Amino acid sequence: MSILHDITRLLLPRRCPVCQRRLEYTEQSLCAVCASCLPRLWLPGIDDNDMLRHLWTRVPVEHAFSLVAYRHNSPFHQLLMRIKYQSDTALAYRLGWWAGSEAVRAGLDEYADVLVPVPLTARRLRERGYNQARLLADGMGRAMGVPVMELLVRQQQGTSQTH
């Protein structure tokens, strides 16, 4: 690390987006306490799980996995609200980096040839100005060393999954 980087971290310390505690030097996105409190999913395998079956009905994929269960009023829900509705794009990238790092730690990165974010409708993209799935995928891809490609086209508007 450069001296400038170290000075910047001293003057502008990074904080955990959940509890606002100052991140330790080894903590990249979330503090260890908050990361350990996320409702993790360790699926039985990436070749036979609910996520894969769900996606296969929409688009052919060989492998799929999910790291965190979505639950209303959980810290993870609060993070997604900040990303989607408070334009916290930096948080999206950081959360993606965390997820990608966890995938690498679990050895799941060896199965990934490409990460494909789910697209927004043109109207939603205009309203929001960014695709949070793309930002999450960019962070994951960077951590995993895997390219991100936009290969899907949104055909219809669905309902919000976070409300």
Whereabouts are the PLM-identified features?
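Glycine-rich phosphate/pyrophosphate-handling loop used in enzymes and phosphotransfer proteins
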Residues: 1-163
